[in-house]
Amino acid sequence: MLKLIVPTIMLLPLTWLSKKHMIWINTTTHSLIISIIPLLFFNQINNNLFSCSPTFSSDPLTTPLLMLTTWLLPLTIMASQRHLSSEPLSRKKLYLSMLISLQISLIMTFTATELIMFYIFFETTLIPTLAIITRWGNQPERLNAGTYFLFYTLVGSLPLLIALIYTHNTLGSLNILLLTLTAQELSNSWANNLMWLAYTMAFMVKMPLYGLHLWLPKAHVEAPIAGSMVLAAVLLKLGGYGMMRLTLILNPLTKHMAYPFLVLSLWGMIMTSSICLRQTDLKSLIAYSSISHMALVVTAILIQTPWSFTGAVILMIAHGLTSSLLFCLANSNYERTHSRIMILSQGLQTLLPLMAFWWLLASLANLALPPTINLLGELSVLVTTFSWSNITLLLTGLNMLVTALYSLYMFTTTQWGSLTHHINNMKPSFTRENTLMFMHLSPILLLSLNPDIITGFSS
């Protein structure tokens, strides 16, 4: 794993030693080269020592998430150039250092084999994210958003730490591989039920589950473009990854405890989708759509079948790329109109036809149109929820309908209609922006040709 961690750490001195005119080129190209390294981990069936050590290791669940994390760093750097154009050089370097340190902590979180190390790095991701939101956000409300983000995450994570200490005192080890192989069947007692809640609550806040989601729209809306992209694409996936790892160890207790959370996530999925139909703020709409998609992932994980895990992993990767793409498009609108209100940016199709094309593709990917990878993820989850209970088909089917409605509502409101009077001159779409959209969309479309590489555990 050091072949991935060390080059990423070396991006920090590269950033600070780069000249003013080379800082963007150096960081983008080197981070793009680093994003190729996780592809080597797909060979681990024949060569297991390739990516395994006592401290860090990768498996078919970790590797797709590592790919997503490393692929996203060059994209966030490309997306932030306009946002940072008026900042002094030292602040640009500090901003890039925050993004790189966030990537380092994410890689270590996904690959940690000890649960206490996983917890430490899980919490470490909070620091650079909080700095990015509260320092580089656009509006004064960013401080309020940062407070929500901090307290929700910390309060949710404290029971996890207590549960980990209790488990270590009881079993003498917190190694994920050992715990998975030697897991005892937990009885359905009050103490074990509370321990299950303590283990999963941190991840349900992070996902977030409906009811624990109030921090997410605020954080998304107030964060700068890189903050929104990383938050939507990778940080929410930490919750899904942690739940997948720990619910397997806590079986068969998960099967007893899952029912209220399954109902809550299915209900929350429809509620948040419906909220999207009433949004006027573009970033807020995309944030609520993230909650809706992640509710489907929570449902899949709690059903605890190999197929549902496959659907959850595919959906996490697909949602990471799609939501990041939507935030990039929303940011391109914001940089030109200086407003997140959708009605004020209507009719942009006449001025920016190529950007309208990216908007159309992003909206169609969001509603899971073939041949995107989103469709495969949603169908896998749909089939597993239906086999678990027939009634869920009504809820998941209704959710797909509402998702299609708000995706088309978002596209038509921003692209069609007559131009508003305050838009009198507008810069055309830049090559950088078009490259950015292409680099988001190409994996969404290409992964559908060979989805085996991101099917997680079942591979």
Curated annotation (Swiss-Prot):
Main location: mitochondrion
Catalytic activity entry: a ubiquinone + NADH + 5 H(+)(in) = a ubiquinol + NAD(+) + 4 H(+)(out)
EC number(s) recorded for this UniProt protein: 7.1.1.2
Subcellular location: Mitochondrion inner membrane
Enzyme class at the top of the EC tree: translocase
An individual GO BP term: mitochondrial respiratory chain complex I assembly
A Pfam family hit: Oxidored_q5_N
The keyword Thylakoid is assigned to this record: no
Keywords: Disease variant, Dystonia, Electron transport, Leber hereditary optic neuropathy, MELAS syndrome, Membrane, Mitochondrion, Mitochondrion inner membrane, NAD, Primary mitochondrial disease, Respiratory chain, Translocase, Transmembrane, Transmembrane helix, Transport, Ubiquinone
Translocase among keywords: yes
GO MF annotation: an example: ubiquinone binding
Membrane-related topology note: Multi-pass membrane protein
InterPro entries registered for this protein in UniProt: NADH4_N (IPR000260), NADH_Q_OxRdtase_chainM/4 (IPR010227), NADH_UbQ_OxRdtase (IPR003918), ND/Mrp_TM (IPR001750)
Transmembrane segments: 22-42, 60-80, 102-122, 145-165, 196-216, 224-244, 257-277, 284-303, 308-330, 351-371, 391-411
CC per GO annotation: mitochondrial inner membrane; mitochondrion; respiratory chain complex I
Signal peptide location: none
Family stated for the protein in its record: Belongs to the complex I subunit 4 family.
Subunit structure: Core subunit of respiratory chain NADH dehydrogenase (Complex I) which is composed of 45 different subunits.
Disease annotated for this entry: Leber hereditary optic neuropathy: A maternally inherited form of Leber hereditary optic neuropathy, a mitochondrial disease resulting in bilateral painless loss of central vision due to selective degeneration of the retinal ganglion cells and their axons. The disorder shows incomplete penetrance and male predominance. Cardiac conduction defects and neurological defects have also been described in some LHON patients. LHON results from primary mitochondrial DNA mutations affecting the respiratory chain complexes. Leber hereditary optic neuropathy with dystonia: A form of Leber hereditary optic neuropathy, a mitochondrial disease resulting in bilateral painless loss of central vision due to selective degeneration of the retinal ganglion cells and their axons. The disorder shows incomplete penetrance and male predominance. LDYT is characterized by the association of optic atrophy and central vision loss with dystonia.
Function, in words: Core subunit of the mitochondrial membrane respiratory chain NADH dehydrogenase (Complex I) which catalyzes electron transfer from NADH through the respiratory chain, using ubiquinone as an electron acceptor. Essential for the catalytic activity and assembly of complex I.
Name of the protein this chain belongs to: NADH-ubiquinone oxidoreductase chain 4
Gene source species: Homo sapiens
Gene name of this polypeptide: MT-ND4
